[in-house]
């Protein structure tokens, strides 16, 4: 793991809209716009290449026996909310779900996560992803958006108290609408286009960035965003309070005005499943911003959340308390959270 390049306590949280709250977690309400989805994950005990003939792709018709299968609770809104709750936050997912939501509802209720922002459409299914992985870790994925196609019927303008928010991947119209409504209310929020990148053109991206408080993408998405908008990293950064770019196992970079904070990756004890690490990172970042942490600390908190997630299968199966998180943070980065 790369060593911390700068003492976190020495740098201010430029662009923060929140007062620093030392001591135990200061609970603030965070609205999480995005999807709640089921992830059905299957493992094919062979290699796809042994069953697909390259010269017969025009008549592709294959079937794979998958003796191993598991169903996980997922979706960006669900994953972020789950991780934020672990830290002691108060997440409110805003999402559209379908007639089969009951098991997920019970899971959220058991976690103590509020569901008054979740709207159920009984004539549709909850969004779901079907992933088949072979022994080379190649994947064939099918995604059914289901009720997510009606997510624009959820209006964040009607939520009575919102301290902070994130607009994560969701239905196209819902994302445009939620950005507009948060901006109109003056609510600070993170714009997280993620897998929804193909849904928007350059004009739409430029408009959403200019209305956002923060923007977060991974390194590949950052290149796409620059291509679509015609803006380079510095130009995007000057339009928001912070522009965060994650680089997987290489850490992340937080651009704040003319400042650049290189965030080292946290150490993981074992690598089990990277799925959902980005959502865990976002939860850690949101929690740190709401606590008024400086950017180097915020980035490290986010990085540690991602590392703790990678040690477990699925996206919502890790368990720890804030005290355990804070102790691990001190062990890894050499200083204590206030």
Description of each model-found segment:
Residues 116-121, 129-173:
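Conserved phosphate-binding/catalytic loop of the ribokinase/pfkB sugar-kinase fold
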Residues 36, 170, 280:
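Active-site metal-binding loops of divalent metal-dependent hydrolases
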Residues 1-26:
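Intrinsic disorder/low-complexity segments
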Residues 177, 183-190, 194-264, 270:
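Conserved phosphate/ATP/ADP-binding segment of small-molecule kinases
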Residues 94-99, 116-126, 241-247:
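Beta-strand->loop->alpha-helix junctions that form or flank phosphate-binding loops
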Residues 90-116:
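A glycine-rich beta-to-alpha transition motif near the start of alpha/beta enzyme domains, typified by
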Residues 20, 26-92, 103, 336-338:
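Glycine-rich phosphate/adenosyl-contacting loop at the front of the ribokinase-like
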Residues 230-338:
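Conserved phosphate-binding/catalytic region of the ribokinase-like
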């Amino acid at each position: 793991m790369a060593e911390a390049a700068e003492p976190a306590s020495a740098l201010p949280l430029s662009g923060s809209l929140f007062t620093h709250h030392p001591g135990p977690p200061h609970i603030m309400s965070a609205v999480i716009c995005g999807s709640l989805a089921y992830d059905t994950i299957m493992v094919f005990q062979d290699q796809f290449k042994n069953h697909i003939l390259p010269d017969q792709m025009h008549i592709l018709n294959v079937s794979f026996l998958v003796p191993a299968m598991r169903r996980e609770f997922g979706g960006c809104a669900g994953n972020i909310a789950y991780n934020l709750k672990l830290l002691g936050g108060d997440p409110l997912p805003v999402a559209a779900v379908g007639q089969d939501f009951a098991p997920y509802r019970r899971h959220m209720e058991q976690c103590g996560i509020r569901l008054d922002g979740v709207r159920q459409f009984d004539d549709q299914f909850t969004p779901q992803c079907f992933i088949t992985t072979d022994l080379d870790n190649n994947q064939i994925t099918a995604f059914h958006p289901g009720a997510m196609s009606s997510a624009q019927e959820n209006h964040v303008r009607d939520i009575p108290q919102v301290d902070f928010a994130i607009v994560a991947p969701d239905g196209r119209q819902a994302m445009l609408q939620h950005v507009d409504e948060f901006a109109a209310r003056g609510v600070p929020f993170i714009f997280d286009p993620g897998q929804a990148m193909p849904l928007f053109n350059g004009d739409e991206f430029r408009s959403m960035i200019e209305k956002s408080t923060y923007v977060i993408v991974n390194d590949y998405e950052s290149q796409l965003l620059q291509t679509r908008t015609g803006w380079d990293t510095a130009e995007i950064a000057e339009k928001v309070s912070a522009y965060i770019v994650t680089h997987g196992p290489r850490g992340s970079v937080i651009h704040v005005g003319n400042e650049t904070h290189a965030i080292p990756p946290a150490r993981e004890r074992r690598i089990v499943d990277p799925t959902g690490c980005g959502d865990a990172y976002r939860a850690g970042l949101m929690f740190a911003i709401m606590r008024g942490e400086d950017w180097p600390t915020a980035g490290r908190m986010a990085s540690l959340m991602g590392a703790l997630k990678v040690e477990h299968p699925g996206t919502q199966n890790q368990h720890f308390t804030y005290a355990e998180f804070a102790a691990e943070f001190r062990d890894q980065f050499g200083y204590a959270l206030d």
